[in-house]
UniProtKB/Swiss-Prot annotation:
It is a single-pass membrane protein. The gene is Myct1. This is Myc target protein 1. It comes from the Eukaryota. One of its GO terms (biological process) is hematopoietic stem cell homeostasis. GO terms for cellular component: nuclear body; nuclear membrane. Keywords: Membrane, Nucleus, Phosphoprotein, Transmembrane, Transmembrane helix. It is found in: Nucleus membrane. The chain crosses the membrane at residues 24-44. The lineage of its organism: Eukaryota, Metazoa, Chordata, Craniata, Vertebrata. InterPro entries: Myc_target_1. Belongs to the MYCT1 family. Coiled coil: none annotated. It comes from Mus musculus.
Length: 188
């Protein structure tokens, strides 16, 4: 009969596991190196893109000293503007202003008013008159004479209608007085 022998040896080469561990370690190291390079490249490009958009144009190298008051018409972020003194914001707040595109600067006429091109969320403005300045607005019967006398107080500035629209910065009329709401819905 034929001699039937089985080989008890491993089907793998002698240093297979050592080579496998070495190749795995080298591939992980190469992957980490490539990943780190790509991460650094993306961080560099994102910081460069962010730095190319000007946040503030208050740098002394870009404008002469004589145009200090003209700086209020520029776009960007400004801290402690003159209009914030009338607002309810804290001292450390920022005034956010729309950023105009550099291509559109010369194509459209610019507004000369800093207040017209800036968002003021808590600016305290007097209410608008309902009709023209020569006519009184019609008030409900619940309005008291003290409310009528405060509607045209001498301390309030005179706001006029312009040719096309109202002057910039005026707010909508306030809600009705709290006393009239409380009288309309008494507690039971």
């Amino acid at each position: 009969m034929a001699n039937n022998t089985t080989s008890l040896g491993s089907p793998w080469p002698e240093n297979f596991w050592e080579d496998l561990i070495m190749s795995f370690t080298v591939s992980v190291a190469i992957g980490l190196a490539i990943g780190g390079f790509l991460w650094a490249l993306f961080v560099f490009l994102s910081r460069r893109r962010r730095a190319s958009a000007p946040i503030s144009q208050w740098s002394p190298t870009r404008r002469p000293r004589s145009s200090y008051n003209h700086g209020l018409n520029r776009t960007g972020f400004y801290r402690h503007s003159g209009y914030e003194r009338r607002s309810n914001l804290s001292l450390a707040s920022l005034t956010f202003q729309r950023q105009a595109s550099m291509e559109l600067v010369n194509s459209f006429p610019r507004k000369s008013s800093f207040r017209a091109s800036t968002f003021h969320p808590f600016l305290q403005c007097p209410p608008l008159p309902v009709e023209t300045e020569s006519q009184l607005m019609t008030l409900s019967a619940s309005t008291t004479p003290s409310t009528l006398s405060t509607a045209h107080s001498p301390s309030r500035p005179d706001f006029r209608w312009s040719s096309n629209s109202l002057r910039m910065g005026l707010s909508t009329p306030p809600p009705p007085a709290y006393e009239s709401i409380i009288k309309a819905f008494p507690d039971s």
